[in-house]
Amino acid sequence: MIARRRFRHRLEYGAVRGLGALLVALPHRCALAVACGVAAVVYALASGRRREAARRVRLVFGESLRPVDVSRICWTSFRNTAFNAVEMIRIRKLSLAQMEEMIPELPAAVASLRELMARTGGRGLVVALPHMGNWDLAGSGCHLSGLPIFSVAGRQRNPMMNDLLNRLRSGHGMDILERGGGALRQILERIRAGQVFAILPDTRSPTPDLLVPFLGGAANLARGMASFAYAAEVPVVPIVMRRRGWRHFTLTLHEPIWPDKTAPKAVELERITKTVATIVDAAIHETPEQWFWYNRRWVLDPVV
């Protein structure tokens, strides 16, 4: 069993590296075209994942969407995920000028974040980036712009793929902490030292936490994002990224959510988490095809 698993891991790693080498060698738009074709084949074959994504979309939007609209949302979300992978595989080839051409609002966003950091007395920020646009690319763009940004990621089952993903995510030097161990302490220390912590706020916590209204249901969201902001006395800044066409993006910075240290901690953690969830909910309803509907942990599933 162990030998079979190792063989499968090597096969997966080899296939990804081989395809990755091709995508790096091609011009950017050609690489996206290849990814679009591969995504179309996989999408046609992955009927179970496709049906589950459609079920989720219908659960959120009910009868307000036609079947053709549901299909469009599911396909665009899937295709954009393939595009995200291409951009991360090619991340080392992207200069700051190219990043700013792809994300025109990047310089203004970084400037706004720096202004906020100047108001925290030498501390950093917590940035809430939902699964929209290319959230990894947004973090890399901020780091390439000189912003001391870092994030945390879970460990993949395939150790070779885990190392590869971390190398890609840190392609321009962005620090990635591995979830678990002493990561929680490190996150708080880094924020207090003036770094920016980027976190995905729209994933279901695997253990009971805060039940928050989200997408027409109740989502069990982790209070960690709000806890770090409260403990470090820094704001949470929700940022929504959207793909425009094949290779361009928009960035929308929402008003910072400052913790109120005079209020009870539990009340503040719930308020901050709910405020971010409301912003993300509105963004998903506005452009549902931009959100990632294929997460294995569906955000509205109850915690068992």
Predicted regions located by residue number:
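Membrane-anchoring hydrophobic helices of lipid-metabolizing enzymes
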Residues: 1-129, 166-167, 171-173
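Non-catalytic C-terminal accessory region of glycerolipid acyltransferases
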Residues: 2-11, 36, 42-45, 63, ...
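Short Gly/charged-rich anion-binding patches and loops
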Residues: 18, 52, 137, 164, ...
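Catalytic core of membrane glycerolipid acyltransferases/transacylases, capturing the structured
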Residues: 122-181, 204-210
